[in-house]
Amino acid sequence: MPAPTIYYIRHGETAWNAEGRFQGSQDIPLNELGRRQAADAGGILADLCAHDGRSESALTFVASPLERARSTMELVRDVLKLPVGDYAVDDRLREIGYGRWEGSTLAQMQASDPEIFAARLRDKWSVSPPDGESYASVQARMSDWYNQLTTDTVAVAHGGTARALMVVLGVETSDSAADLAIEQGAVYVFSEGGLRKYS
């Protein structure tokens, strides 16, 4: 049986994204640009489904429990003319936890915890922020999530979970994925043919 295709969308921009602040588990709403990015992603997904001759309603839809991901999902579904609230929420898709660093910029992180910051620069995948979560642990929960998929799925989540999924599927290594930019307003398609980004 072929592996399910995943249409992966990172949530749209928030005020903290615009300010360079790390959100992690904090529930920051979309800003105006973020809402436009979500609608753009919905349009891209509609075009991909039309090109592939597939019905959007036949896909499974699942989002991170955080508001910025759920709002993005609802805007995507609105563009697709599907009932906006008819999707699943899965806690495994939540963003990497930044612990004490949530709400901070990189400069503030370095100033508050210089030794941990330096260690994380050397090994971002395995070193956790203070009271936070490592990418390795996010990779474990994303592997668990992926391994239970049985149908082609639209997932709306975060940059950190996208990087972890890329490592789970062998598209990137932990070294190459750790600092990879994940675009907002794009659709990342994971399939047996690898990964393609549409924006």
Region annotations inferred by a language model:
Residues 6, 59, 148-160:
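Generic beta-sheet signal
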Residues 7, 13-82, 133:
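Active-site-proximal alpha-helix that buttresses catalytic centers in soluble enzyme cores
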Residues 14, 161-162:
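Short active-site segment of divalent metal-dependent hydrolases/proteases
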Residues 63-66, 92, 157-160:
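Short, well-ordered beta-to-alpha junction loops that form the rim of enzyme active sites
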Residues 75, 164-168:
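Active-site signature of alpha/beta-hydrolase-fold catalytic machinery across serine-
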Residues 78-141, 191, 198-199:
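Phosphate-handling substructures
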Residues 143-151, 189-190:
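Alpha-helix C-terminal capping segments
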Residues 172-198:
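Domain-level recognition of soluble alpha/beta enzyme cores
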